[in-house]
Amino acid sequence: RPIYLTFDLDWFDPSIMPGTGTPEPGGYLWRDFAAIVEVLKSHNLIGADVVELSPKLDNTGISSILAAKVIRSLIMLLDKSS
């Protein structure tokens, strides 16, 4: 069955994703996202979008870097040749 994924960045803990409009204390870490990516490898992911990045709320830039890593991981999942 085809899967379209909307990934909300406020799922991450504010310690690694402060640049979101609705931070979630006690949120998840990168390793948790990596585990989801591993599960998705065996499913039919046909598209994805990433939401809730607000770079103005993060003067360190770490949120934009993490968002780019998430997008890269999802693109790699969508690339059936990889």
Residues of each region from the PLM?
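Catalytic cores of soluble, metal-dependent hydrolases
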Residues: 1-82
